[in-house]
Amino acid sequence: MAAAASLVRSLTIAQTSRSPQMRQFFTTPNLKMESSNHHTSDRDVATELHHDAPVPNESANSSQDVPWYLQVEPVIETTHPIARQQQIPDVPENAPSITREILQHLSLEIGLDDMVLLDLRGRDPLPALGGNVIMVIGSARGVKHLNVSADRFCRWLRSTYKLRPYADGLLGRNELKIKLRRKARRARLASSAGTTADTSDDGITTGWICVNIGSVDDPSVIQNMREGGFEGFGKVQGGTRIVVQMFTEEKRADVDLEQLWAPKKDVTGPDSEKRSILAEEDYQVRLQSSTPTEHKSNQPMSNVPRPPPRIDLSQRRNFSTVMRQKSVHTDVKSGSNYDTADVGDELGHQERQLSAIFQTINGLSPDELIEQLGSGPQDMGSTELLRDCYSFAGTDSNRKSTIRLMLSAVAVSLQHPGYTKEYLWKLFLEQTASGYRLSELQAFEIASAFLVPRLESQEQKRTISELVDFDIESAMRVMDNLSLSGETIIMKHRLYNMMYRALLLSLADGNANKNNARLKALRIRTLMDEIGLEWQGTDARETMQLRLLLGDVDGFYEIWHAIAFNEGSRTADDYEVLFRVHAEAGNAAHARECLAVWISMMGRENPPVQPDAGIISAIAKCAYVAGQHANTFRLSLVSNEWEKAQPLIVEEMRTLEQLS
C-alpha cells in the first residue's frame, strides 16, 4: 500500500508540473462521494495529496478563466458636462446659515454656472471689500441673462431676508429698455443713411455685475479679529460680508478673479515648490559668495538670510567707476583721507558758485549778454564773462563741461547767431555720457532753450516740421534724463509749461493742425487738475498765458480766478498780462468779452488798479483786436485817473490803425 501511494503521488506531481491546473465548471453541486470499498489509508492519502497540491491564485486568474461573453465590465460613473457646470460648491466652516440657501438659489433659480466660493476671511492684507468676506463667482449665459439674474437676485434678497444689496454695474429695468431702444434707433438711422453704427462702448453693460449683499449677522460666526489695534475709522462691524460676482463667460476669463483671490496653497503645485526651492538654494549660494572669506572677528560668522536693501527713489542716481565691494561690511583704512561729508560740502560749494555766476548772467540785458557771449562756442576769452567762467572751471572736466553747456543754453535762448541747437544737443549728450549730473534748474534752462524759435538763417537744410520735431524731442529727452536722476518734476509748473511751449512751437509749421494742438492742451490741463497743483507765483501766470495762446479759454480763466482766491487780489501786472495775452491770441470775440467784463473789475480790486504805461498799451492792443475804433472807444470804468488815461488809450489805438 505504501508503494502504491508513493506511485500515485509521483504521477500526480508529474502531471501537475507538466500542465497548469485548470478549474472546471459544473452545473451540478459538488457531491460528497463516500465509498465503503476504499480503506481509511486511501482517504488519508487523498487528503495528503490535496494539501500538497499548489493552490491557484483565483484573483489573478479570474479574468483569464472566465470567458469573454461572461465577463462583466466595471461600472464607470460618468457625469454630464451640464451637471458638472451646475455643481454647488461646498460651504466653508463657520459660514452664515444663509450661505447655503444663497448658493442653492443662485444655481437652481437664477441659473448661474461654474460657481466658485472663495473664503477670504482672515486674509492678510485684507480685501478692499472688508475683513470678513465670502465671495461667490458665477457665470451667466449671456448679457441679458446677466442683467435679469442680478435684478431677480436682488429682489429675492429684499423680499426674503429684508436685506439691502447693492448691485454695481446693474441697470434698472426701465433704464435698460430705454438704452436698448436708443441703440436700436441709432442702428436703424445708420443703416438708412448707408453708414455703420458706432461700435464703441454704449454703457449698457460691462459683462460684470458685483452684488454686495452686505454684512450678514450670525452669532455662530467666529470673528478672526486682530489682537491689538484697529484698521480704519469708526466702529468695528461684526458679521460676514457676502459678495456675489456675476460675469459673462468672456469677461470672467478676462478678469480671472479666481486666480487673483485663490489662496496660494491651492494654486501652488510641485513645479512651483520646485522653483521656490531652487530660488532659495540660489539665494543661499549668492549669499555665501557675497560673504568675505576671512575676517578678524573672534565670533563665528552666521549665514543669516537678509532681505535685499530697499532703494529710495527720492535719491539721485549717480554714475560711478568704482567696482562695488562684495562684502557687506567695508573696512575703512585709518590712513585714508576720503571723507564723504567733505565731498558733499565740496559739491554743494561748486553748485553755489555756479548759481552765483548764472545769477550774474541773468542780471544782464539781452543785448549785453549776447555781446558778452562772444562770437561762438570756440570763443573762450574775448569777453570778461567768458574769462571769468572758464577760469573758474580750471582743469576740472565736470565743471568745464557744465559751464560750456549752460553758456550754450543761454546763447540759444537769446537766439545768438553763433550757437545752434544741434551744438547744444551735442554738449548735452557729452554731459550725460560722462556721468556728470545736472541740477533741476540747469535741466529746465536747457530744455527751454530747445523750445525757443530758431533764426531764419538756421532753417535752410531741413524743413520746418523736421526742425520742430527735433527741438521738441530734444527738450523732452532732457526732461526724461532729469526724471531718471530722481527729481520729482511732475509737481513742477515748469514741466507743464514746457509741454505748452512745445505745442506752441509745433504750430510754427503752417501745416500743423490747430485742433490737434488744442486737444493736447486740454489733456495737459486734465493732468494738472488731477495732480492738484496750486496756482501761485510766476510759473502759474506763465501757464495761464500759454493756455490762452493755445485756445484753452476755460483753462485760462481757471487760473485767473484761482490767483485772486489764493493771493487775495490781482495786481496791475496781472491785468496787463490779461489784456496783452488776449491781444496776442487774436480772437476778436474773446477780446471783446475781456474788455466788457474786466475793465470795470479793475476798480473793485483792493487796492484799485491804477493806470500806467504798460496797462494802457495792453488795453489799446486788446481793443484794436476786438474790432473797436478809436473814435467810438469808451472806458466803462469811471474814475478820475482812468478818465485822464482814456485819451492815451485812444491815441495808441490810432497809432495801431495807421500801422495796419
From Swiss-Prot:
Gene3D superfamilies: Beta Polymerase, domain 2. One of its GO terms (biological process) is mitochondrial gene expression. It is a peripheral membrane protein. InterPro entries: Atp25, NT_sf. Keywords: Membrane, Mitochondrion, Mitochondrion inner membrane, Transit peptide. One of its GO terms (cellular component) is mitochondrial inner membrane. Residues 287-302 have a biased composition (Polar residues). Its main location: mitochondrion. Transmembrane segments: none annotated. Residues 287-313 are annotated as: Disordered. It is found in: Mitochondrion inner membrane. Residues 1-32 form a transit peptide. Belongs to the ATP25 family. Probable mitochondrial mRNA stabilization factor. This is ATPase synthesis protein 25, mitochondrial. It comes from Talaromyces marneffei (strain ATCC 18224 / CBS 334.59 / QM 7333) (Penicillium marneffei).
